[in-house]
UniProtKB/Swiss-Prot annotation:
Transmembrane segments: none annotated. It comes from Pediococcus acidilactici. Binds 1 Mg(2+) ion per subunit. Binds 2 Zn(2+) ions per subunit. This is DNA-directed RNA polymerase subunit beta'. Its EC number is 2.7.7.6. Gene3D superfamilies: 1.10.132.30, 1.10.1790.20, 1.10.40.90, 2.40.40.20, 2.40.50.100, RNA polymerase II, clamp domain, RNA polymerase Rpb1, domain 3. The gene is rpoC. Keywords: DNA-directed RNA polymerase, Magnesium, Metal-binding, Nucleotidyltransferase, Transcription, Transferase, Zinc.
Length: 1055
């Protein structure tokens, strides 16, 4: 037999009866399994040692031959070969069937393979196979036709009429005879002839039949092998009987299914020997057919065979299907040694590439390493002794453990692993307790928090694995997210509020206008209370020689605050001095406006200057990205740790708290609400008089309340004290946003009903005042829907990611340059007035197809085939260029992948992508990972009649990726030309849109409720949508070309 442990790939095919018998080591004749007293396998049964091999290594069944020296001998008493018991995992048996039986996969699969080969409907096949109708196999010289079905009564009548001049059969034998009579070559030729004329359904069927028939010719399989004379029996160790405590046995379902087949087969043999009446034999044959069906695929036809407790039995097919099956559970996803899992806790004192490992876990995970080290240090005489020492928890074991885990990275993983940042490597540090400690900045990549999350830990054993973990997977390397190249390790929550508080400016605080020599003096003054963190002070610029100030600035006094000096102290020495949170300061240095000439009056200047805003979360992220770009990994991870420590320390010192008094009342609120009530009354009056429809009234009411809420929100924003802790939290990006705030202090606003429609009744109260009973009840709908949506969408999103990875995993960067001469013209993606993705983001990190030239100066900004970096991308935008031709994966010529130039920058490193990078998987994960955040709702536009629901969120992504026919499709024009007329036909409920092209004109009929995207007299191109909705990509490909369809899909997904 083949070596079952070494294989490259698998394929499912047909086995001939001879092949099945060749595989087999003997025939299983009895349904018995093991003897209930001796627990030894029964002879000729499903566990027979003569067929499948010995149950104990190198020992025959009767015990005459024991030990390895008799290897290969077949015992003369019991007939068992003396060999390893492992052969029971690979030796098959077989069952000789007393009547041929069809294979359910080939009869029931879609499309039915048997039906296609025989050109018969599955319906009639079923009647033949399950003994409801006879089929004419050979009409002889009678007027009957081949493959004609006859009922029992018709068959008897024809027998009386024609005698044995024709042959008709029933059951598996009939199908076998028909399949044996198929001449494949002749059928194929006939079909090819037919394809020349046929069209429509006939053609489709002919193509399908030709496919199957040519496949049979090519593979050399015979169609009649779809009917089985013998069936293989799976090796017994793959369907074992396990003894439970209490002497009972747990058996595999296959045992029951095989037993049913063997029992019915033996009964059929006996009936045939007895020459039993035909009807009894037929019934037994049908039962055998059903038993074999159940064994191969239980439940595919009729009711599944159930075991104890009415549970359907798991058949052979079920063992290959789904998540729990053989492939995904055992072959592709094995459990691994040297792994553990535990609850995680925050480790604020850890470095970027460290994790805290509890001592008991470390002891267990690194046991072999500790044992080896104990022996090599002569602290233990042998391995057994070393093991005993570990179990006794001797003192010296801990010293060894400390040394063993040094420089030995471990992998941490948190389920669900949605993208490659879900597994990262850290260096372990021993901690007390039983919880693992995770670095606070690693949380975002894992999407972890400390409310009881658990994580798994794995120890890479070999030197290669350790090296790979250290070089490629260390958490310090994963600073940018592979999906968009933005930092994934930005400080959050406490760290943000700490840095925000630190960089605030406050007018007229203690010591305002003092001038200092250098940072040390500032620190001293801070300690002694001469200045506060937020005091605006002056510092000699020359005290910071490394900073990139201009020569003129170096002579001057820099106006800043003590807090900002502390913040700048954590940045690299020669990095720009940050005084205000704006991006151009990051790139272009500190502006002159923050400097004073030596003799100027600082107090006068300070009175004129506005207060600068503090550093928010987004700005911190930009700082990190900029530092990463200039200084790469090491410096960035050091900066991150310093920023984390500073943030935690300062947020503690700030003493930021939230009390009920921080939620302010809005005096204007009653007036705004009264005005809204008045407007609603007016609208209702108009409706009562019949001036507007009910839908219009609903729309307007919703609009009125939304406006009222927005106005309250705006007033709240205006009246806020910048020192208000809640405002600081939301403004800095630490926690919460403005709408939380409006709900606390303004009004909650409109809520959605369970069906997703917005209710007209707004919640006027806020949480500070408290909700009335009715308001409380209304607002619970939304909360419940949110919970159910989240649960459903996780599963859907995970499945989508899996399918995406499946199709994209072989897209790899294969070469440096494919030399294509095609590219893509890129513009910003916008929908109406809303910018979805600006041009800057789309061209950054891509290679140009043609040189980009400044239209005014004629200067070449980027040459041909060069990468567009941040600086040149900004230049292109500043020059007012709206579109750029770039290299794209859509137009890449590389076979089975893409080339470096067409792909562009590797987002995770900010450098060129390297050959061998698995960009397909990265792309699939980047779409799949945010999938969980997308909504499940099919968006209902506030009830305007006829704007068919346009699908959005996760369902829309699935629709696009699978090229389904979209819901609420948009009609597209097939010609380029002018929209001649748009006529409504109320009787038919349609709109007729006529587009006049250069050569011909086309008329499209749309539902009368459709929202138009074109008006009469518009000039449109082919493929342009006429009404709002989603374009069907299959139509677009017919009208335009592949490239424009790819572009459309791309822009849709980006939304």
């Amino acid at each position: 037999m083949i070596d079952v442990n070494k294989f490259e790939s698998m394929q499912i095919g047909l086995a001939s009866p001879d092949k099945i018998r060749m595989w087999s080591y003997g025939e299983v004749k009895k349904p018995e399994t093991i003897n209930y007293r001796t627990l030894k396998p029964e002879k000729d049964g499903l566990f027979d040692e003569r067929i499948f091999g010995p149950t104990k290594d190198y020992e025959c069944a009767c015990g005459k031959y024991k030990r390895i020296r008799y290897k290969g001998i077949v015992c003369d008493r019991c007939g068992v070969e003396v060999t390893k018991s492992k052969v029971r995992r690979e030796r098959m048996g077989h069952i000789e069937l007393a009547a041929p039986v069809t294979h359910i996969w080939y009869f029931k699969g879609i499309p039915s393979r048997m039906g296609l080969v025989l050109d018969m409907s599955p319906r009639s096949l079923e009647e033949i196979i399950y003994f409801a109708s006879y089929v004419v196999v050979d009409p002889g010289d009678t007027p009957l036709e081949k493959k004609q079905l006859l009922t029992e009564r018709e068959y008897r009548a024809k027998l009386d009429e024609y005698g044995n001049r024709f042959v008709a059969k029933i059951g598996g034998e009939a199908i076998q005879a028909l399949l044996q009579s198929v001449d494949l070559e002749k059928e194929a030729n006939l079909l090819k002839e037919e394809l020349k004329e046929a069209s429509g359904q006939k053609r489709t069927r002919a193509v399908r039949r030709l496919d199957i028939i040519e496949a049979f010719i090519k593979s050399g399989n015979h169609p009649d092998w779809m009917v089985m004379d013998a069936i293989p029996v799976m090796p017994p160790d793959l369907r074992p009987m396990v003894q439970l405590d209490g002497g009972r046995f747990a058996t595999s379902d296959l045992k029951h299914l095989y037993r049913r087949v063997i029992n019915r087969n033996n009964r059929l043999k006996r009936l045939l020997d007895l020459n039993a009446p035909g009807i009894i034999v037929q019934n037994e044959k049908r039962m055998l057919q059903e038993a074999v069906d159940a064994l191969i695929d239980n439940g595919r036809r009729g009711r599944p065979v159930a075991g104890p407790g009415n549970r359907p039995l798991k058949s052979l097919s079920h063992m290959l299907k789904g998540k729990q099956e053989g492939f995904r559970q055992n072959l592709l996803g094995k459990r691994v040694d040297y792994s553990g899992r535990s609850v995680i806790d925050v480790g604020p004192s850890l470095k970027m590439n460290q994790m805290g490992l509890p001592v008991p876990m470390a002891m267990e995970l690194f046991k072999p390493f500790i044992m080896k080290e104990l022996v090599s240090r002569n602290l233990a005489s042998n391995i057994k002794n070393a093991k005993r020492k570990i179990d006794r928890k001797d003192e010296e074991v801990y010293d060894v453990l400390e040394d063993v885990i040094k420089e030995h990275p471990v992998l941490l993983n948190r389920a669900p692993t949605l993208h490659r940042l879900g597994i990262q490597a850290f260096e372990p540090v021993l901690v007390s307790g039983k919880a693992m400690r995770l670095h606070p900045l690693a949380c975002e990549a894992y999407n972890a928090d400390f409310d009881g999350d658990q994580m798994a830990i794995h120890v890479p054993l070999s030197n290669e694995a350790q090296a790979e973990a250290r070089l490629l997977m260390l958490a310090a390397h994963h600073i940018l997210a592979p999906k968009d190249g933005k930092p994934v390790v930005t400080p959050s929550q406490d760290m943000v509020i700490g840095n925000y508080w630190l960089t605030m400016e406050r007018a007229e605080s203690v010591g305002e206008g003092m001038i200092f020599n250098d940072l040390d003096e500032v620190k001293l003054a801070l300690q002694n209370g001469y200045v506060s963190i937020h005091t605006r002070i002056g510092v000699r610029a020359s005290s910071m020689p490394e900073k990139p100030f201009t020569d003129q600035q170096r002579q001057q006094i820099l106006i800043t605050t003590a807090g900002k000096m502390l913040f700048n102290d954590i940045l690299p020495k020669d990095f720009v001095y940050l005084n205000a949170p704006t991006n151009e300061k990051l790139v272009n240095g500190t502006p002159d406006e923050y400097f004073l000439e030596a003799g100027e009056d600082i107090h006068e200047q300070l009175n004129q200057r506005p207060l600068l805003s503090p550093f928010k979360s987004g700005f911190l992220s930009d700082v990190i990205a900029e530092v990463y770009k200039q200084y790469k990994v090491t410096e960035t991870s050091l900066l991150l740790d310093r920023m984390k420590d500073l943030g935690f320390y300062r947020s503690t010192l700030s003493g930021l708290t939230v009390g009920i008094a921080d939620i302010t009342n809005l005096p204007d609120k009653p007036a705004i609400i009264a005005a809204a009530h008045k407007k609603v009354a007016t609208v209702t009056k108009q409706f009562r008089r019949g001036l507007i429809t009910d839908d219009e009234r609903y729309e307007r009411v919703i609009g009125i309340w939304n406006d009222a809420k927005d106005e309250i929100q705006q007033r709240l924003m205006d009246t806020f004290d910048p020192q208000n802790p809640i405002f600081m939290m939301s403004d800095s990006g630490a926690r919460g946003n403005i709408s939380n705030f409006t709900q606390l202090a303004g009004m909650r606003g409109l809520m959605a009903a369970p069906n997703g429609k917005i209710m007209e009744l707004p919640i006027l109260s806020n949480f500070r005042e408290g909700l009335s009973v009715l308001e409380m009840f209304i607002s619970t709908h939304g909360a419940r829907k949110g919970m159910t949506d989240t649960a459903l969408k996780t599963a859907n999103s995970g499945y989508l990611t899996r399918r995406l990875v499946d199709v994209a995993q072989d897209v790899i960067v294969r070469e440096k340059d494919c030399g294509t001469d095609r590219g893509l013209l890129i513009t910003a993606i916008a929908e109406g007035n809303e910018m979805i993705e600006p041009l800057y983001d789309r061209i950054l990190g891509r290679y140009t197809m043609k040189s980009v030239i400044n239209p005014e100066t004629g200067k070449v900004i980027v040459g041909q085939n060069e990468m567009i970096d941040e600086r040149s991308a900004q230049e292109i935008i500043d020059a007012g260029i709206q579109e750029v031709t770039i290299r794209s994966a859509f137009t890449c010529n590389t076979a089975h992948g893409v080339c470096e130039k067409c792909y562009g920058r590797n987002m995770a490193t900010g450098d060129r992508v390297e050959v061998g990078e698995a960009v397909g998987t990265v792309a699939a994960q980047s779409i799949g990972e945010p999938g969980t955040q997308l909504t499940m709702r099919n968006f209902h536009t506030g009830g305007v009649a006829g704007n068919a629901d346009i699908t959005q969120g996760l369902p829309r992504i699935q629709e696009i990726v699978e090229a389904r026919n979209p819901k609420g499709p948009a009609e597209i024009s097939e010609v380029t030309g002018v929209v001649e007329s748009i006529e409504e036909d109320p009787a038919e409920g349609t709109k007729e849109v006529t587009v006049k092209g250069e050569t011909d004109s086309r008329t499209y009929s749309l539902p009368i409720t459709a929202r138009m995207k074109v008006a009469e007299g518009d000039y449109i191109h082919r493929g342009a949508p006429l009404n709002e909705g989603s374009i069907d990509p299959k139509k677009l490909i017919k009208v335009r070309d592949v490239l424009s369809t790819e572009n459309y899909l791309l822009s849709e997904i980006q939304k």
